[in-house]
Curated annotation (Swiss-Prot):
PTM sites of type Phosphothreonine: 154
Species of origin: Homo sapiens
Gene: NCF4
PROSITE patterns: PB1, PX, SH3
Resulting phenotype, residue 251 to A: No effect on phosphorylation
Binding residues annotated for a 1,2-diacyl-sn-glycero-3-phospho-(1D-myo-inositol-3-phosphate), in chain numbering: 58-60, 92-94
Listed Pfam families: PB1, PX, SH3_1
Top-level taxon in the UniProt lineage: Eukaryota
Reported effect, residue 58 to Q: Abolishes interaction with membranes enriched in phosphatidylinositol 3-phosphate
Name this polypeptide is given: Neutrophil cytosol factor 4
GO cellular component, one term: endosome membrane
Residue ranges constituting the SH3 domain according to the UniProt record: 170-229
GO molecular function, one term: phosphatidylinositol-3-phosphate binding
Tissue occurrence: Expression is restricted to hematopoietic cells.
Subunit structure of this chain's protein: Component of the phagocyte NADPH oxidase complex composed of an obligatory core heterodimer formed by the membrane proteins CYBA and CYBB and the cytosolic regulatory subunits NCF1/p47-phox, NCF2/p67-phox, NCF4/p40-phox and the small GTPase RAC1 or RAC2. Part of a cytosolic complex composed at least by NCF1, NCF2 and NCF4. Interacts with NCF2 and NCF1. The NCF2-NCF4 complex interacts with GBP7 (via GB1/RHD3-type G domain).
Length: 339
């Protein structure tokens, strides 16, 4: 019997919480324009309790997790009783096209996650492992673009009675078929031109889920005309507020950032983002401390301190709690030098 099967046959595994991840598979990659342009892996996670959900992770997050696990469970860890053979993470690649690199990593990262989730239960219960596979509020707000490696999910629903309340039916999201559509699998909905399809969900930008004549399935948006769309959803875009100071004027600009509000960026990524947005290279990044004085950001540690100090402060919805104050690199008059 394989090690993973032995572990799952033991009572320790049965006593794990239902929300512990037991399998994970990469469904797609997507480009994100966060503090810097990058690709994320869209990962379908399955839990012991049978739940499924999607999470979005960068390679650097895999690397950070592996580093922590090596400290705790590697051959040189202080807790030798908990040491185990950790899976190998594919190495960093420093040169190449980002999308091609991400695509090439998928098989190795899938194998990495499979091996990781087959380790002893104390690894599965490790705080950083659980956080890595946990669906954060940011993850849950994302709308997957394609999920090329998974079929779009569907669900069973009760059929809508033709004798049902006609007012309720007319208020429901619905679409009219423009063309005949015959699905390639039982997951896909068949309909004829002119059919009115009641909409259940938006799978992604190209596919919808709906029901017609008691059947439920997915279908391409291009085959229908929307008669009544879904209610408008809250825009999931987060914004970084920047105060830009020139010699005689200052301006405020909010930059759209596809990152979790709780994330901590790297200084080089913030510099790249602001230089691109303000079309200036000779700038310095700052934040205001508790006394209201400007403090220049010189390292990743400074950025982490800025983020920590902003936690708990009141902030607007979709706006990072910390703000950037952008000054000219050689202008030191903006700093308070009084003791």
């Amino acid at each position: 019997m394989a090690v993973a099967q032995q572990l799952r046959a033991e009572s320790d595994f049965e006593q794990l919480p239902d929300d512990v991840a037991i399998s994970a598979n990469i469904a797609d990659i997507e480009e994100k324009r966060g503090f810097t342009s990058h690709f994320v892996f869209v990962i379908e996670v399955k839990t012991k309790g049978g739940s499924k959900y999607l999470i979005y992770r960068r390679y650097r997050q895999f690397h950070a997790l592996q580093s922590k696990l090596e400290e705790r469970f590697g051959p040189d860890s202080k807790s030798s009783a908990l040491a185990c053979t950790l899976p190998t993470l594919p190495a960093k690649v420093y040169v190449g096209v980002k999308q091609e690199i991400a695509e090439m990593r998928i098989p190795a990262l899938n194998a990495y996650m499979k091996s990781l989730l087959s380790l002893p239960v104390w690894v599965l219960m490790d705080e950083d492992v659980r956080i890595f596979f946990y669906q954060s509020p940011y993850d849950s707000e994302q709308v997957p673009q394609a999920l090329r490696r998974l079929r779009p999910r569907t669900r069973k629903v009760k059929s809508v009675s033709p004798q049902g309340n006609s007012v309720d039916r007319m208020a429901a999201p619905r679409a009219e078929a423009l063309f005949d559509f015959t699905g390639n699998s039982k997951l896909e909905l068949n309909f004829k031109a002119g059919d009115v399809i009641f909409l259940l969900s938006r799978i992604n930008k190209d596919w919808l889920e709906g029901t017609v004549r008691g059947a439920t399935g997915i279908f391409p948006l291009s085959f229908v005309k929307i008669l009544k769309d879904f209610p408008e959803e809250d825009d999931p875009t987060n914004w970084l507020r920047c105060y830009y100071y020139e010699d005689t004027i200052s301006t405020i600009k909010d930059i759209a950032v596809e990152e979790d509000l709780s994330s901590t960026p790297l200084l080089k990524d913030l510099l790249e983002l602001t230089r691109r947005e303000f079309q200036r290279e000779d700038i310095a990044l700052n934040y205001r401390d508790a006394e209201g004085d400007l403090v220049r950001l010189l390292s990743d540690e400074d950025v982490a301190l800025m983020v920590r100090q902003a936690r708990g402060l009141p902030s607007q919805k979709r706006l990072f709690p910390w703000k950037l104050h952008i000054t000219q690199k050689d202008n030191y008059r903006v700093y308070n030098t009084m003791p």
